[in-house]
UniProtKB/Swiss-Prot annotation:
L-aspartate binds at residues 173, 219, 446, 487. Pfam families: GAD (PF02938), tRNA-synt_2 (PF00152), tRNA_anti-codon (PF01336). This is Aspartate--tRNA ligase. PROSITE patterns: AA_TRNA_LIGASE_II. InterPro entries: Aa-tRNA-synt_II, aa-tRNA-synth_II, aa-tRNA-synth_II/BPL/LPL, Asp-tRNA-ligase_1, Asp-tRNA-ligase_1_N, Asp/Asn-tRNA-synth_IIb, AspRS_core, GAD-like_sf. It catalyses: tRNA(Asp) + L-aspartate + ATP = L-aspartyl-tRNA(Asp) + AMP + diphosphate. One of its GO terms (biological process) is aspartyl-tRNA aminoacylation. Its EC number is 6.1.1.12. The gene is aspS. Residues 197-200 are annotated as: Aspartate. One of its GO terms (cellular component) is cytoplasm. It is an enzyme of class 6 (ligase).
Length: 587
């Protein structure tokens, strides 16, 4: 037996017991004739004491222990004279009588502490060391608890967990696939699934009316803080349901997770907002509702007064930051530079302060009378001490997106984006299609299997761009944590959808014939939803990136710097797969 207890287990009630512990040396320090060692394992830290007066040889051996040595000790639990109430074991220490060094260690390249001195790159290269840090371990423990609660909740609702294949056919619609060459079928390739979408629909055709799976998915796309090339979905599908049934079931699951994992009771129904309203008032289909600053459109008030920036604009809109009139000129200039950054793209920003006497002082006073500025103030319901920030531009959608970024930045600066406050809502009634400038055609906003709203089906023939989808996203604190839709279960409607998306009948049959054929054998009405497990965990843990809740993540270039992957294959492997590498140089 290597240990009788863990390093986070012993308490004052255990005083006098002989115990054996094993773990890693967090730190060792010599003070006079005593040596103190903090021993760490997954469960906590326990202080060890070596007394030179009692056993000089043992104490000398302890003096040679380095950081991250793996040791086993036996000793007696003793009450500490200088208690550390910041840790659960802080009232006791172990007077060591036996020390075994199980493994020595070279000095790690960064400190194994919550506030480590290691940067992102070095910690990812030595991820196995980074995982020893308490804060990282807690994220993975939270992830484990979440998957347990997900399974418990869905099992209680009659869902079956069914695994679907990892090697599937490629469907180029949407994000890029990761492809896998087949040795046994030269010149042919599998793809890693972007989601189990069509497979779970086939399970509905098969009669498995409530399916779920906690599943790895893969997308070869550009990365950012909330994306990884491989990620985990809580994937679910239900038969004989309408949108309201699905929303009710998975809102219930969200409330269950909040209660069990965060101790937060969400008794009220989640807010609902149409996609059109989300864009109109927040410039985003995933609005952060922890704070206000709803957009106000100012076209009728601000156009036609000789200020060409506004007079030539297709959209003028603003936000009102309560109590922020004290912003200095320097702060306002910094906000202007913020919105002018290339990734945001605004040309500038107009601001106006509401003074103590109710008058409005703006950066464009010479173009506007106080009467017009008062109309603007009333449009915002602004009060003395408030700050109004305005953007304009030739493209309404782009300008709203810029205003969204400004709103989020001001909310951050004012401390309104509290990570311990949760604002949940459903965004519904998405457009069925969106226009792709790159492709020169309509694309499915979600995927080709989304059912249009019944009342909009006639528009498929006359005005497909106006069709709304039976689709819904759950948004928490400005993060899309999940989304889904009612699916098409009629092969004729599915064929119509492929036609609008530019598929020839031959291409539709080649890529999705298996699904179209299945529908001919009696497909039930069905729909579903997929939650992003990584996003849920990072939200509950208060993280800025999903990378911190994944055991072995990729960096922003999609590389695993620890495994040095991806990497070139040996020529023998390429020959076996009948592959030739021909890298085209960028022109």
């Amino acid at each position: 037996m290597f240990r009788s207890h863990t390093c986070g287990e012993l308490r004052l009630s255990d005083a006098g017991k002989s115990v054996t512990l094993a773990g890693w040396v967090q730190r060792a320090r010599k003070m006079g004739g005593m040596t103190f060692v903090d021993l760490r394992d997954r469960y906590g830290i326990t202080q060890l004491v070596f007394n030179e007066a009692v056993n000089a040889e043992l104490c000398e051996r302890a003096n040679h222990l380095g950081r991250e040595f793996v040791i086993q000790i036996t000793g007696e639990v003793n009450e500490r004279s200088n208690k550390n109430m910041n840790i659960p074991t802080g009232e006791i220490e172990i007077i060591v009588s036996v020390l075994n060094v199980l493994n020595s260690a070279v000095t790690p390249p960064f400190t194994i502490e919550d506030n480590s001195d290691g940067g992102d790159d070095i910690r990812m290269k030595f991820r196995y060391l980074d995982l020893r840090r308490n804060c990282v371990r807690k994220n993975l423990e939270l992830r484990h608890k979440m998957t347990m609660e997900v399974r418990r909740y869905l099992d209680s609702k009659g869902f079956l967990e069914v695994e679907t294949p990892m090697l599937v056919g490629s469907t180029p619609e949407g994000a890029r696939d990761f492809v896998v060459p087949s040795r046994m079928n030269p010149g042919q390739f599998y793809a890693l699934p972007q989601s189990p979408q069509t497979l779970k629909q086939l399970l509905m055709v098969s009669g498995f009316d409530r399916y779920f799976q906690i599943v790895k998915c893969f997308r070869d796309e550009d990365l950012r803080a909330d994306r990884q090339p491989e990620f985990t979905q809580i994937d679910c599908e239900m038969s004989f349901v309408e949108q309201e049934d699905i929303i009710s079931t998975f809102e219930g699951m969200a409330k269950h997770l909040f209660k069990e994992l965060r101790g937060v009771e969400l008794s009220e129904p989640f807010l609902r907002m149409t996609w059109a309203d989300a864009i109109k008032y927040y410039g985003s289909d995933k609005p952060d509702l922890r704070f206000g600053m709803k957009f106000v459109e100012l076209m009728d008030i601000m156009k036609g007064h000789g200020f060409s920036v506004f007079d030539d604009a297709a959209y003028i809109g603003g936000i009102c930051a309560e109590g922020a009139a004290s912003y200095t000129r320097k702060q306002l200039d910094q906000l202007t530079e913020f919105v002018k950054k290339p990734q945001i793209g605004a040309k500038g920003m107009v601001y106006a302060r509401v003074e103590a006497d109710g008058n409005v002082k703006s950066s464009v006073d010479k173009f506007y009378s106080q009467e017009v500025l008062q109309q603007m103030k009333e449009a915002f319901s602004a009060k003395p001490g408030d700050l109004i920030l305005i953007l304009s531009g030739p493209d309404a959608m782009k300008t709203r997106k810029q205003l969204c970024e400004l709103r989020l930045e001001v909310g951050r600066q004012l401390g309104l984006r509290d990570k311990n406050k949760f604002a949940c809502l459903w965004v519904v009634d998405f457009p069925m299609f969106e226009w792709s400038e790159e492709e020169g055609r309509l694309m499915a906003m979600h995927h080709p299997f989304t059912h249009p709203k019944e009342e909009d089906i006639p528009l498929l023939d006359t005005d497909p761009a106006a069709v709304r989808a039976d689709a819904y996203d759950m948004v928490v604190n400005g993060v899309e944590v999940g989304g889904g839709s009612i699916r098409i279960h009629d092969s004729q409607l599915q064929a119509k959808m492929f036609e609008i998306l530019g598929f020839t009948p031959e291409r539709a049959q080649e890529q999705f014939g298996f699904l179209m054929n299945a529908f001919k054998y009696g497909a039930p009405p069905h729909g579903g939803l997929a939650y992003g497990l990584d996003r849920w965990v990072s939200l509950f843990a208060g993280l800025d990136s999903i990378r911190d809740c994944i055991a072995f993540p990729k960096n922003n270039s999609g590389r695993d710097v620890m495994l040095d992957a991806p990497a070139a294959l040996d020529q023998s492997q390429l020959d076996e797969l009948n592959l030739v590498v021909d890298i085209k140089e960028d022109k």
